[in-house]
């Protein structure tokens, strides 16, 4: 529709403000000469196949990751959200709980991390994180998945073991379907 008037104009103005605020935050990050940021991919489609015991054919999974970057040697898989996201939305204290509806944001970015590691044959030679930039919570910056039950002592690095536990739980769900 026409973005010069009415509701469409308001939505457009909000989107412009979100983008400008985000870019200002990125610029601020880069004013510190110690920070090294490389954007490796945007809007990248990733795919792989899962072999599940008891299912006679491979299950294809895919997703489109908003951004892959490297910040100070840490590879980050990033999803942008226009809505409100807080760090508690990305806390994964137990992989078995990843069936719960409120865990969908963590599930999404962990799935992107899994897809990235499989489709790019990633060997975990550098730290890996997955998380969200929430445009309604930009002051919190990049919100990574946190595997710690103690918010004061975060555990945000994704290892191959953590991804295997994650995908094991997803395979259990697929077997039930």
For each feature predicted by the language model, list its residue ranges:
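Structural signature of nuclease core domains in nucleic-acid processing machines
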Residues: 1-177
């Amino acid at each position: 529709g026409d973005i010069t008037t009415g509701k469409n104009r308001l939505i457009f103005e909000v989107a412009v403000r979100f983008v400008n605020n985000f870019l200002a935050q990125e610029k601020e990050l880069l004013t510190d000469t110690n920070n090294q940021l490389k954007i490796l991919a945007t809007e990248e489609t990733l795919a792989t196949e899962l072999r599940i015991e008891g299912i006679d054919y491979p299950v294809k999974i895919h997703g489109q990751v908003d951004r892959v970057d490297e910040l100070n040697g840490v590879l980050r898989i990033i999803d942008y959200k226009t809505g409100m996201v807080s760090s508690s939305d990305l806390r994964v204290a137990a992989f078995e709980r990843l069936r719960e509806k409120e865990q969908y944001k963590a599930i999404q970015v962990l799935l992107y991390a899994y897809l990235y590691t499989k489709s790019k044959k990633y060997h975990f030679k550098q730290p890996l994180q997955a998380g969200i930039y929430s445009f309604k919570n930009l002051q919190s910056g990049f919100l990574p998945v946190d595997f710690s039950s103690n918010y004061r002592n975060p555990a945000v690095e994704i290892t191959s073991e953590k991804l295997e536990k994650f995908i094991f739980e997803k395979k259990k769900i697929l077997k039930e379907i």
